[in-house]
């Protein structure tokens, strides 16, 4: 997701190049074929999945640069090393109690977070036995490997890349920075107290919405739980809780550290949030049209952290902490680390973007789900909002 200081919200998005438009049209043709095969329209989560992950064509599967100033958005690790240093401090504390274990990152992006964390762990004398990177994109794997070879040449041989979770259970720490928000979501609208599920159809003017009175049960439960009124439109992420439950069964002991933008359930489904949280990003422009340039733009939705906590509990994980990103980083000595930097302006810039409410500090949350960990986690020593879940 883009951060506030470099994000243009609304307005006209840039026009892609001819080659990029041709690429998008190939994906559009594939999605049109899927819509014709369905006859009644394509469920929105399947449209979103194709737009993001269709092999060779989807946004995350096509190889174009996504991260940083030349991409579509900036993530916290790309701002500078302070974020990864603080995360490394927390990881070291967990390994101190575990005594051994695996460090696994899901969706490592450019590899910057893992590189910063490993450098911090080197200084702290807390390098793990094994490092695993769960990455399905061949292009991103290459970028991660190149970065780690450059920054940790003596350690990279101990890093293994995976395309799926380890088959056996394990102990250790799992990092997931901006992973859940990229999972396809179902979109629904409330009518006469019941959910209408969003489908995508193709008309002469392009893709459009169609609404079906079918439900898997999750939307109905949300309507009942939060008293959602008629004409309320929002999303439900059914895949993120399933992802948490699957990981929870494999993590025999340790901590899952989730960093993402979102809210507790009662804030996510607040009566005033009547159009949900669906957001698209293209060349640092944010807008709400998921049908614009399929395959060229990111499509995201915020995280319902109450649902994540409940999914963790179902697989035996407890919430070991829940905080804003600002609270988490400040608990781990962000300001002291910034003061020690030689470049005061760069340090101030990082602190600003990572902690200010108008930037990433408040919208981004950190949740720790743990099993078999007794010591309180340092990252939640200044602020813990678990009771808000």
Q: What does each model-identified segment do?
A:
Residues 115, 143, 184-186, 268-269:
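Short glycine-/acidic-enriched loop or helix-start segments at secondary-structure transitions
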Residues 2-106, 110-170, 327-330, 336, ...:
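Rossmann-like AdoMet
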Residues 217-389:
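Long, Lys/Arg- and hydrophobic-enriched amphipathic alpha-helices
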Residues 51, 174, 308:
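A residue-level signal for conserved active-site and pocket-lining positions in enzyme catalytic cores
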Residues 60, 182-185, 267, 376-378:
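Short helix/loop capping segments that flank catalytic or ligand/cofactor-binding pockets
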Residues 173-221, 271-281:
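A mobile, often basic/glycine-rich helix-loop segment
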């Amino acid at each position: 997701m883009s951060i506030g200081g470099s994000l243009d919200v609304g307005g006209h998005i840039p026009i892609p190049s001819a080659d990029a438009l041709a690429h998008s049209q190939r994906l559009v043709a594939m999605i049109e074929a899927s819509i014709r095969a369905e006859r009644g329209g394509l469920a929105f989560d399947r449209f979103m999945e194709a737009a993001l992950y269709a092999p060779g064509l989807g946004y995350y599967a096509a190889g174009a640069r996504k991260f940083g100033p030349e991409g579509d958005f900036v993530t916290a690790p790309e701002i500078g090393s302070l974020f990864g240093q603080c995360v490394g401090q927390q990881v070291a504390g967990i390994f101190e109690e575990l005594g051994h274990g695996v460090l696994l990152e899901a969706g490592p992006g450019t590899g910057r977070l893992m590189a910063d964390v490993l450098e911090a762990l080197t200084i702290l004398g807390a390098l793990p036995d094994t490092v695993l990177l769960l990455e399905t994109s061949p292009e991103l794997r290459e970028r991660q490997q190149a970065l780690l070879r450059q920054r940790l040449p003596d350690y990279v041989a101990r890093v293994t890349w995976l395309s799926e979770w380890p088959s056996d259970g394990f102990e250790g720490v799992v990092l997931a920075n901006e992973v859940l928000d990229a999972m396809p979501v179902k979109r629904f609208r409330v009518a006469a107290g019941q959910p209408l599920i969003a489908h995508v159809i193709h008309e002469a003017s392009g893709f459009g919405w169609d609404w079906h009175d079918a439900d898997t049960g999750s939307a109905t439960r949300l309507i009942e739980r939060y008293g959602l009124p008629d004409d309320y439109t929002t999303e439900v992420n059914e895949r993120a809780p399933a992802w948490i439950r699957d990981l929870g069964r494999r993590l025999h002991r340790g901590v899952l550290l989730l960093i993402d933008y979102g809210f507790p359930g009662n804030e996510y489904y607040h009566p005033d949030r009547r159009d949900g949280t669906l957001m698209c990003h293209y060349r640092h422009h944010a807008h709400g049209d998921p049908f614009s340039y399929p395959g060229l733009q990111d499509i995201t939705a915020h995280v319902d952290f109450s649902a994540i906590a409940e999914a963790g509990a179902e697989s035996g994980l407890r919430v070991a902490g829940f905080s804003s990103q600002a609270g988490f980083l400040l608990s781990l000595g962000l300001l002291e680390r910034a003061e020690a930097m030689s470049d005061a302006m760069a340090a101030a810039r990082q602190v600003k973007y990572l902690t200010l409410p108008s930037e990433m500090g408040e919208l981004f949350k950190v949740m720790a789900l743990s099993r078999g960990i007794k010591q309180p986690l340092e990252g939640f020593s200044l602020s813990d909002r678990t009771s808000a879940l």
